[in-house]
Amino acid sequence: MGIFSETVPITAVTTYIDRLTSRDTDDEDLSGIVQLSEAVNLTVTGPREASRTLRKKLKYSTPHEQVRALVILQALIENAGSHFLQNFSDEKLEDRMLQCATNSEYSKPVRKRAIHMIKLWHNDYSNVRGMESMSSLVSRLPQRQSSASHSEQPTINLKKVGPILERLIASSSMAATNLSNSLVRINPNTENPAKNKQIMVYYVDCKRAHRSLLRYIQAIQDEMWLANLLKANDEIVTAIDAFKEKCSENSDYSSDSGSYSSSYSRHLDDRASYISRSSSGGSNAQRSEDLDVNNPFGDHNRLE
């Protein structure tokens, strides 16, 4: 090793990524993402190590491993939190993503997924701290690619997506319960909910779940699943509305909480609209963040 070579720490982050990109994993398998996210957040260098390892997978690995690297990258963006978002991006990763999207040496599934991810970042992450450069990559795509890729309708396989929906409904219910219970325990006249870090964590969880629910409500036609998704969405909306009501009751909310909330949860895309409790389906659903970014109607097959 040369005297000017960078010393690269190898931790559990690299070990997890190696395991999650192995050839015996399914393309869309998201098991292990929670553990990887925790490992990334354990150290200051975790996000950069993850970025570097994924970039090398995209450059040197097989098509399957490249797809897996893209899956993991998007899952980390959506689940690893602000520490990852604000520290993972660099010029080398940006250039590699463009290569994945435009270079014919990459397989069609890799190119298609990379294009969808770049478009997603532009649509949903332009105002997210740490994602400024990644969200601007769309301007560097060839015009044909930057304007294409919405014509194909995703194929919905309920057998495959069923477990994902179950997890989403359960996690949404838990998020709504956590936020609602935490709001009951405070006095809005003396404590601003938007200044309570734990409440803000629950609020962020609800916002993420809400956008995922909207995406599935728009896509799912099965009446049983749709009813369960709408019920979960109602719980989330009730909790979020309660948070806003508590904030409005606080005497200094109008002057203080806005700046705190925006800085603490800046990564949220508040463009997502609430779906009415009386909605019969996905007609009012807006574009939203999908917890399972790589399922047939996830972010790489964006629903308009």
Swiss-Prot record:
Entry keyword set: Cytoplasm, Cytoskeleton, Endocytosis
GO cellular component: actin cortical patch; cell cortex; mitotic spindle pole body
Pfam families given in the database record: VHS
Major site of localization recorded for this protein: cytoplasm
Intracellular or extracellular location(s): Cytoplasm, Cell cortex; Cytoplasm, Cytoskeleton
Biased amino acid composition, Low complexity: 274-286
Location of the VHS domain: 20-149
Residue segments, region Disordered: 274-304
Role, per record: Essential for the organization of the actin cytoskeleton, fluid phase endocytosis and vesicle trafficking.
UniProt record similarity statement: Belongs to the LSB5 family.
Name used for this protein in its record: Protein lsb5
